[in-house]
């Protein structure tokens, strides 16, 4: 509702002659992934029904407002973030913001309750916050700061998930969410399975449940790369192996030995089949790792670096890459960001 209200206010401001924009960067959203609506033309009903505009719909979870709500430390921080939200470009190339549009108050009214974390419970009665979750491939892929801080305040232990693999999810969790809110994780759990490792080892998806020591060994470098990346951030790492009923004991032992050789803790998780009881070994290893203590986060890059330098640091330190090549569209976007001169290049 807030996302589409903002889109309507932008179109209304243009229709009323309040602003002349050369580009509108804000799109509408809906909950159905309808590819026919990704790129459309609106305002075809004549002067009384708006200005013809090339636009489109994104899926709701991809809305920038979701990322803003999840990163906001409180209502005042939310207002500041909404004020500086860029929704379009004026004819002179400068940014047209939500504050300039005068839409912040209306959005605050809609998002005020959305800032409150949703408290639920597992089937075993364990309390949990389910709140937020912007996509990690286009945003930061973490739950809300409000939910994390609430969990840390009321519980002895707070566990949060960073979406996607550790190269994407953990990196953004550390470099964006933790850095912007002064959070210091005590340990990091890296989840894997024999099936996943065999798939990385080249086995076709229908065959990953079968015993295949060669494929497992071929997939282990992927796990070791993730471990090395997490250790570079200064984290105590616990590898949690999701257990399946037909897992081979010898293959599990190979993974265990590789983890111990890499200097990290290892435990088998049977939580899917046995609930909390099946995850006790993981919990014990996490508690032991926390006692040893992680170092203060060693971020992948400095905020003083240029955008290109930050991308290169993530590429080499996290993904193990060498050089970065940019598409023409990416280069145009970088040029726009720098031309706005709003300090974006100094953000995580």
State each model region's role:
Residues 1-348:
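Flexible phosphate-sensing "switch/lid" loops adjacent to ATP/NTP-binding sites
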């Amino acid at each position: 509702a807030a996302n589409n209200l903002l889109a309507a206010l932008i179109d209304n401001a243009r229709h009323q002659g309040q602003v002349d924009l050369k580009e509108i960067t804000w799109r509408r959203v809906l909950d159905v992934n309808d590819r026919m609506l990704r790129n459309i033309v609106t305002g075809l009903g004549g002067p009384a029904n708006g200005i013809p505009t090339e636009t489109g719909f994104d899926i709701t979870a991809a809305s920038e407002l979701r990322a803003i709500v999840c990163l906001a430390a409180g209502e005042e921080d939310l207002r500041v973030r909404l004020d500086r939200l860029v929704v379009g470009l004026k004819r002179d190339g400068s940014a047209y913001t939500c504050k300039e549009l005068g839409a912040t108050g209306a959005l605050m009214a809609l998002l005020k309750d959305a800032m409150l974390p949703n408290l639920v419970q597992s089937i075993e009665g364990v309390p949990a916050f389910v709140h937020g979750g912007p996509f990690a491939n286009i945003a930061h892929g973490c739950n809300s700061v409000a939910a994390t801080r609430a969990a840390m305040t009321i519980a002895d232990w707070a566990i949060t998930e960073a979406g996607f693999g550790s190269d994407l999810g953990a990196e953004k969790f550390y470099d964006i969410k933790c850095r912007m809110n002064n959070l210091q994780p005590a340990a990091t759990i890296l989840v894997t399975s024999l099936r996943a490792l065999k798939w990385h080892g080249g086995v076709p998806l229908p065959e990953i449940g079968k015993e295949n020591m060669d494929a497992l060994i071929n997939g282990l470098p992927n796990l070791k790369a993730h471990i090395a990346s997490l250790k570079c951030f200064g984290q105590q790492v616990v590898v949690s192996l999701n257990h399946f009923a037909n897992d081979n004991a010898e293959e599990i032992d190979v993974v265990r030995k590789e983890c111990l050789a890499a200097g990290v803790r290892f435990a088998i998780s049977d939580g899917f089949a046995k609930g909390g009881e099946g995850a006790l070994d993981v919990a014990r290893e996490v508690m032991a790792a926390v006692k040893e203590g992680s170092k203060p986060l060693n971020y992948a890059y400095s905020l003083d670096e240029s955008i290109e330098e930050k991308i290169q640091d993530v590429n080499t330190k996290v993904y193990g890459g060498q050089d970065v090549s940019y598409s023409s569209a990416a280069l145009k976007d970088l040029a726009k960001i720098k031309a706005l001169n709003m300090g974006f290049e100094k953000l995580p």
